[in-house]
């Protein structure tokens, strides 16, 4: 299965993104902000199922500039070496600039080591050291995630440069990340 949608990047408009932010953060919401939509491409993979290891999700950068990107908000696998991986729960989180595995620019959950609510094997849990980082595009572990949020390699540089630029523009040490489901997005947008 092709890990990226054939239709290109998500088609969510700026106005729709602003409506989501207003719903989740209120009228005086700060910008820039990131919006993650789990299951944005509901017909990609198994229809009606939240798939792993494909870019069937979306991540939106809303600030002075606006851009949508393909994304993955799930781990590449349900388990790795017998260990249940984390599916981050929908919610509002803070991220800061940082390195992924000390190798390249990424976003790291803030404050460092914060416990983020997640589900592992259907059980409520928490996860630490969640990043938004570059994913892969081919192979067995396409999205390169053990619970982090990932953007395809071919879109990564444009994504992270835009996010860092938006954060620098307003001198923001952190950026808000809203994670919702496709179903919640549809309810908000009416």
Which residue stretches match the model-derived regions?
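Cell wall/extracellular polymer interaction/catalysis modules
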Residues: 1-142, 157, 161-164, 170-175, ...
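Local cysteine-cluster metal-coordination motifs and their immediate loop/turn environment
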Residues: 145
């Amino acid at each position: 299965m092709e890990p990226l949608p054939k239709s290109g990047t998500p088609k969510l408009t700026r106005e729709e993104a602003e409506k989501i932010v207003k719903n989740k953060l209120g009228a005086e919401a700060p910008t820039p902000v990131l919006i993650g939509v789990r299951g944005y491409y509901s017909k990609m993979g198994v229809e009606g199922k939240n798939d792993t290891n494909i870019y069937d999700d979306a991540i939106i950068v809303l600030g002075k500039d606006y851009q949508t990107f393909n994304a993955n908000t799930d781990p590449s696998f349900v388990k790795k070496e017998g260990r249940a991986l984390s599916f981050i729960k929908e919610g509002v989180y803070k991220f800061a600039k940082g390195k992924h595995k000390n190798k390249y620019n990424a976003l790291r959950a803030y404050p460092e080591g914060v416990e983020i609510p997640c589900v592992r094997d259907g059980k409520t849990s928490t996860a630490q050291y969640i990043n938004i980082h570059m994913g892969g595009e081919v192979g067995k572990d396409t999205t390169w995630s053990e619970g982090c949020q990932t953007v395809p390699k071919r879109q990564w540089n444009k994504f992270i440069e835009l996010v860092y630029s938006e954060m620098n523009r307003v001198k923001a040490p952190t950026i808000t990340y809203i994670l919702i489901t496709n179903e919640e997005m549809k309810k908000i947008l009416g």
